[in-house]
Amino acid sequence: MSLERFVKIKYQTNEEKADKLVEGLKELGIECARIIEEKVDLQFDALRHLRENLNDDETFIKLVIANSIVSYQLSGKGEDWWWEFSKYFSQNPPEKSIVEACSKFLPSSRTNRRLVAGKIKRLEKLEPFLNSLTLQELRRYYFENMMGLRNDIAEALGSPKTAKTVVFAVKMFGYAGRIAFGEFVPYPMEIDIPEDVRIKAYTERITNEPPVSFWRRVAEETGIPPLHIDSILWPVLGGKREVMERLKKVCEKWELVLELGSL
């Protein structure tokens, strides 16, 4: 049994770095996150491209959710994976079930070759939930209940609500909803940051506190939801040249973003 609930653990934190992080994020704000998401993130572009070619918002959003839960252990950059996904389904829209279509796509993928059998099993677990959703229900999740979507995806997969692919699925759903419904809805404060390799390594430069709890506290102090904080940090942590060039063109405070990335 963990003693954490009975004993308050004292984590070691570089307070100077933590203060710079919080102050920098406060200065950037949620609007900076939105600019990065919509004008810098190549994954957002990939989803916009897919939606334009599918002309079917229900299928579009369901495809994005399905693809999100298998977006781990990639054999290429995340941005390249989402563009491969977008181009494939723009040319090969699902004829029957979305899960069947994704199961055909994965084995031939260039950027997501690992653990394919396990990923297909995850899709099969999610299938009954996806099949049950109408476009109106997807709209309701977007405008009113993203936390409910997180809970329902976690339950369908038998995963914790903080699991990386679960919270990442909500982030990508938010992108898809923004594109399909034409309105920006901020992510809830209660949905955690995806604890991937980049975020773990970055967090360890500041504290030995577990990333999820650390970023919850940062979110509370800055007023920026964890998923939007992830958006601010990812360009500099990913290191893709095209992304950095886009950041400098559209974000007036790009130097501050770089400064935060180098803490």
From Swiss-Prot:
<dbReference type="GO" id="GO:0006284">
    <property type="term" value="P:base-excision repair"/>
</dbReference>
<dbReference type="GO" id="GO:0000702">
    <property type="term" value="F:oxidized base lesion DNA N-glycosylase activity"/>
</dbReference>
<dbReference type="InterPro" id="IPR016544">
    <property type="entry name" value="AGOG"/>
</dbReference>
<keyword id="KW-0227">DNA damage</keyword>
<keyword id="KW-0378">Hydrolase</keyword>
<feature type="active site">
    <location>
        <position position="196"/>
    </location>
</feature>
<comment type="function">
    <text>DNA repair enzyme that is part of the base excision repair (BER) pathway; protects from oxidative damage by removing the major product of DNA oxidation, 8-oxoguanine (GO), from single- and double-stranded DNA substrates.</text>
</comment>
<comment type="similarity">
    <text>Belongs to the archaeal N-glycosylase/DNA lyase (AGOG) family.</text>
</comment>
<protein>
    <recommendedName>
        <fullName>N-glycosylase/DNA lyase</fullName>
        <ecNumber>3.2.2.-</ecNumber>
        <ecNumber>4.2.99.18</ecNumber>
    </recommendedName>
</protein>
<keyword id="KW-0456">Lyase</keyword>
<keyword id="KW-0228">DNA excision</keyword>
<feature type="region of interest" description="Helix-hairpin-helix">
    <location>
        <begin position="139"/>
        <end position="204"/>
    </location>
</feature>
<feature type="binding site">
    <location>
        <position position="43"/>
    </location>
    <ligand>
        <name>8-oxoguanine</name>
    </ligand>
</feature>
<dbReference type="Pfam" id="PF09171">
    <property type="entry name" value="AGOG"/>
</dbReference>
<feature type="binding site">
    <location>
        <position position="230"/>
    </location>
    <ligand>
        <name>8-oxoguanine</name>
    </ligand>
</feature>
<feature type="binding site">
    <location>
        <position position="82"/>
    </location>
    <ligand>
        <name>8-oxoguanine</name>
    </ligand>
</feature>
<dbReference type="InterPro" id="IPR011257">
    <property type="entry name" value="DNA_glycosylase"/>
</dbReference>
<dbReference type="InterPro" id="IPR015254">
    <property type="entry name" value="AGOG-like"/>
</dbReference>
<feature type="binding site">
    <location>
        <position position="71"/>
    </location>
    <ligand>
        <name>8-oxoguanine</name>
    </ligand>
</feature>
<feature type="binding site">
    <location>
        <position position="168"/>
    </location>
    <ligand>
        <name>8-oxoguanine</name>
    </ligand>
</feature>
<dbReference type="GO" id="GO:0140078">
    <property type="term" value="F:class I DNA-(apurinic or apyrimidinic site) endonuclease activity"/>
</dbReference>
<feature type="active site" description="Schiff-base intermediate with DNA">
    <location>
        <position position="164"/>
    </location>
</feature>
<keyword id="KW-0234">DNA repair</keyword>
<feature type="binding site">
    <location>
        <position position="194"/>
    </location>
    <ligand>
        <name>8-oxoguanine</name>
    </ligand>
</feature>
<feature type="binding site">
    <location>
        <position position="234"/>
    </location>
    <ligand>
        <name>8-oxoguanine</name>
    </ligand>
</feature>
